Regions:
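Short alpha-helical elements
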Residues: 2-139
């Protein structure tokens, strides 16, 4: 009994400085963004061109429309309502997302790509609800 207490005391004094799994937590905004970007690329299909943008005239942006949609979905998934908080958190990921756009550009492009975002969401729901099921689902 005394030996167990001594071992527990030793373990209680140990301090974890860095978790090994810290990089892969689901509140990691970049991890969620990367997963949603891959899903959006698979689902978008013919809605976007090879660079991930809706076909339109003008300069091709470095931060694609699919990346804007994925960033929007990631911020909603994490529960970030404020754009200032979103861009404050994104400063931690400047290395991972080098072509990040400004808040003003994000707002403008998010409004432009809102229909694309809705279509991708509808296709996601269709994939989840109907395509992977063999029997009808009761709602």
């Amino acid at each position: 009994m005394f030996k167990k207490l001594c071992i527990l005391l030793i373990f209680s004094k140990l301090k974890v400085t860095k978790l090994l799994i810290d990089k892969y937590r689901m509140h990691n905004l970049y991890a969620i963004f990367a997963k949603l970007l891959n899903i959006c690329k698979q689902i978008a299909g013919n809605l976007v061109n090879e660079s991930g943008n809706v076909p339109r005239r003008g300069v091709v942006p470095k931060f694609s429309d699919l990346e804007v949609v994925a960033l929007n979905m990631a911020s909603e998934a994490v529960g970030i309502d404020s754009e200032s908080l979103l861009f404050a958190k994104l400063q931690d990921y400047r290395v991972e997302i080098p072509n990040l756009i400004s808040r003003r550009q994000y707002n403008d492009r998010r409004k432009i790509t809102s229909s694309l975002c809705n279509v991708i969401r509808e296709r996601m729901v269709f994939e989840i609800m109907y395509k992977n099921r063999t029997e009808p689902m009761l709602i």
